[in-house]
């Protein structure tokens, strides 16, 4: 992003809103990533300082500690809702890392939107901003990379065995 003189604020990217989802935004010039867990809990990563005028790279990286959706192929939900660790980075340097003891086992934002540069429906955190919360910085590039966990051959064998044992028991 490119922050103008006088600072910037606003939504970079959001998916979801008041009842579930996430937002990546600048608040009083500081980068914030917030994960709204079905309005029961909000986990918030924030940079300690407002971004100075000029070009910056801001990134949110989440490392999931589970097997992921691949377990569903074996009628097993054990890969979903597992913990993970989120890290907020500014110009390549980690500014805050927070572990999440649980994640949502599904996506719950059917009535919300995916927005870039503003938030067009409800906000993920009313305590921080009110929509549309238009971005006042210049967004030069946005990259979204999703690395889904991959089942190992040992994971597959274990899940197949569990599915077969369950079928015998039923």
Where are these regions (language model features)?
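Extracellular glycan-associated modules
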Residues: 1-170
């Amino acid at each position: 992003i490119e922050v103008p003189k006088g600072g910037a604020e606003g939504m970079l990217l959001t998916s979801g809103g008041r009842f579930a989802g996430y937002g990546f935004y600048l608040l009083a010039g500081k980068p914030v990533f917030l994960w709204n867990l079905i309005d029961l809990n909000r986990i918030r990563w924030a940079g300690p300082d407002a971004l100075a005028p000029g070009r910056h790279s801001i990134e949110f990286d989440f490392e999931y500690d589970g097997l992921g959706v691949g377990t569903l192929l074996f009628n097993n939900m054990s890969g979903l809702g597992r913990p993970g660790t989120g890290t907020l980075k500014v110009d390549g340097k980690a500014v805050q890392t927070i572990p999440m003891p649980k994640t949502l086992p599904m996506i719950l934002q059917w009535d919300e939107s995916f927005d870039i540069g503003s938030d067009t429906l409800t906000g993920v955190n009313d305590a921080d901003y009110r929509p549309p919360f238009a971005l006042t910085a210049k967004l030069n590039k946005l990259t979204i990379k999703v690395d889904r966990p991959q089942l190992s051959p040992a994971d597959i064998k274990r899940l197949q065995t569990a599915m077969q044992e369950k079928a015998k028991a039923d």
